């Protein structure tokens, strides 16, 4: 009898949502995703201390300004962790742009190019990297510019259909619609506290995005993210990719059974609608109170963890 993780891999590319190298060795994902929170957690692992020390030493060589050293060391640490992970996976690493730049297109592009250069200088080609950006209008515009320059992007903190549509129209490589955080919001703000997997609002959101992309022939990859339970994952079997935390990878690997494909599209490709304007994007996105709350909340949380990481680095400088 096969286990569910092995079975899931037959219909979906499995990605590890972690910065933990031990988890990569154990579950052997195709790709891996990191974010400021995961980098902060990874930085606490004793085996990573040498990566922190190396990042700090490198930053000292780049500038004598302490503030700049902190920024440089934080960027280099994220890349160092990415480099270690790339030794263990055949595919791509996603590394995130500072969430505090989420409303600044030019600064996001500049930071993305800086991260790419750090990877390139370490011998890693663009084909193995995804730059993560928040799915704000400004982040989507930054991604469109980067894609034209051969830098593929992963648009994260995606909660609304408007965000998904704008990403497809901008030609971004991949989106990460969040499942669990959508469920969290509905549990916290509605009367219903329990949802069957097929009616889970996060699952419904990703399913609708997947269908829309396939119906209209968009090549943007849909990678479901932020899962709260195995039921959500199994309900999205067949999605292009799913990025899954180690605890849920473990649960899947220890469960026997065949996974049934739930998402697929067979049919004619429909004519795409005219491209959204910025005004239309904001109007449609702002019709969704959950998406407004969770996008802002996600940016705040990533920014807080980025600041914690910078403080940790500053204390070591």
From Swiss-Prot:
Pathway given for this chain reads: Carbohydrate degradation; pentose phosphate pathway; D-glyceraldehyde 3-phosphate and beta-D-fructose 6-phosphate from D-ribose 5-phosphate and D-xylulose 5-phosphate (non-oxidative stage): step 2/3
Q: Which reaction does it catalyse?
A: D-sedoheptulose 7-phosphate + D-glyceraldehyde 3-phosphate = D-erythrose 4-phosphate + beta-D-fructose 6-phosphate
GO aspect biological process, one term:
carbohydrate metabolic process
Keyword Cytoplasm assigned to the entry: answer is: yes
One GO term describing the cellular component = cytosol
SUPFAM superfamilies, alphabetized: Aldolase
**Coiled coil region boundaries:** none
Q: Which InterPro entries match?
A: Aldolase_TIM, TAL/FSA, Transaldolase_1, Transaldolase_AS
E.C. number, please?
A: 2.2.1.2
State the compartments where it is located: Cytoplasm
Stated role = Transaldolase is important for the balance of metabolites in the pentose-phosphate pathway.
Q: What is this protein called?
A: Transaldolase 2
User: Which species does the entry assign this protein to?
Assistant: Pectobacterium atrosepticum (strain SCRI 1043 / ATCC BAA-672)
Gene giving rise to this polypeptide: tal2
């Amino acid at each position: 009898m096969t286990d569910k993780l092995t079975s899931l891999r037959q219909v979906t590319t499995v990605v590890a949502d972690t910065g933990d190298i031990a988890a990569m060795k154990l579950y052997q994902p195709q790709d891996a995703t990191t974010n400021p929170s995961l980098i902060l957690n990874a930085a606490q692992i004793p085996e990573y201390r040498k990566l922190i020390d190396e990042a700090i030493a490198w930053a000292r060589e780049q500038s004598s300004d302490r503030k700049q050293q902190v920024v440089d060391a934080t960027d280099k640490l994220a890349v160092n962790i990415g480099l270690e992970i790339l030794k263990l996976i055949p595919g791509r690493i996603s590394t995130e742009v500072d969430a505090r730049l989420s409303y600044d297109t030019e600064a996001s592009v500049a930071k993305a190019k800086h991260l790419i250069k750090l990877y390139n200088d370490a011998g890693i080609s663009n084909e193995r990297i995804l730059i993560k950006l928040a799915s704000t209008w400004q982040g989507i515009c930054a991604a469109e510019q980067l894609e034209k320059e051969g830098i593929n992007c992963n648009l994260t903190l995606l909660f609304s259909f408007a965000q998904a549509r704008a990403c497809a129209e901008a030609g971004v490589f991949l989106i990460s619609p969040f499942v669990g955080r959508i469920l969290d919001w509905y549990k916290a703000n509605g009367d219903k506290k329990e949802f069957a997997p097929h009616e889970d609002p996060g699952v419904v959101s990703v399913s609708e995005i997947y269908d829309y992309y396939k119906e209209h022939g968009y090549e943007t990859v849909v990678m479901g993210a932020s899962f709260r339970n195995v039921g959500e994952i199994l309900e999205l079997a067949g999605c292009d990719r799913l990025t899954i935390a180690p605890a849920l990878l473990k649960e899947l690997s220890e469960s026997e059974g065949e996974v049934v494909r739930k998402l697929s599209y067979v049919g004619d490709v429909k004519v795409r609608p005219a491209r959204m304007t910025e005004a239309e994007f904001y109007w449609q996105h702002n019709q969704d109170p959950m998406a407004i709350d969770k996008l802002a909340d996600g940016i705040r949380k990533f920014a807080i963890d980025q600041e914690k990481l910078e403080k940790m680095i500053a204390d070591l400088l």
